[in-house]
């Protein structure tokens, strides 16, 4: 269905260019040349915005197509350039609406996915805690039956480490953020990525709704982990939170296999640029930037191979 709308868009824009050239030069050759250039421009636009089209609903595309078809009819009324300019303005407005709504829909879809994942991670964390409690009596029995004191101490230490492994990082976090952190730490351990957390202020204290907290934290940690896991050198992630002069400061550093300079020039500025290798849309970086901007915060990043450093400062009031 989306492909049909794209073809219609290409045909309509070519027709507008044809009519515009005809109004200017009254030459058939010039009109056909303008139509060809218009088709090429429309094709290039569709190619560059293909990630946005994928998130656009069929209903919105249908309404925009109706508006564009009706506006093209205006071109047939007159023979001067004014109707053509009006139609081009209508096309630009429709495409601005399409891109804005598609980006919003993609952001909401990502937020729903992140919340669903956070709930699953929180449930998994609860199951893990319950399973440890379930084995408590078995551990006590094993300690009672142990003979050498050294073995008993080592067993107790190992048992305590299992219980306290993530406790200090999850302290003070709400269930959703705790679920995101728990899943991140488990995936980092499975990927042999070293994690250093300095949580002077809970992530749950971020001045956002729980849904936006999950979106911000989840995307930051996911991007850092994906990049660090691909690093050829020492794979590590450092996350620090603190309060400074009325600002909530979140800093994340991660090793990376390298970044394209073209991506660095536009990262956190436009939809469709990703820090990851492969076919990624850059939706995570887009959402991070939108959330920080919406909270009147500031986002800065630096890249000195092999370390990518992200720093976010957001006004904070208790």
From Swiss-Prot:
Member of the two-component regulatory system NatK/NatR that positively regulates the expression of the natAB operon. Potentially phosphorylates NatR. It comes from the Bacteria. Pfam families: HATPase_c (PF02518). Residues 132-318 form the Histidine kinase domain. SMART domains: HATPase_c. Gene3D superfamilies: Histidine kinase-like ATPase, C-terminal domain. It is found in: Cell membrane. It is a multi-pass membrane protein. The gene is natK. GO terms for molecular function: ATP binding; protein histidine kinase activity. Its EC number is 2.7.13.3. This is Sensor histidine kinase NatK. GO terms for cellular component: plasma membrane. The modification Phosphohistidine is found at residue 134. It catalyses: ATP + protein L-histidine = ADP + protein N-phospho-L-histidine. The chain crosses the membrane at residues 4-24, 27-47, 72-82. GO terms for biological process: phosphorelay signal transduction system. The lineage of its organism: Bacteria, Bacillati, Bacillota, Bacilli, Bacillales. InterPro entries: HATPase_C_sf (IPR036890). The keyword Zinc-finger does not apply. Keywords: ATP-binding, Cell membrane, Kinase, Membrane, Nucleotide-binding, Phosphoprotein, Transferase, Transmembrane, Transmembrane helix, Two-component regulatory system.
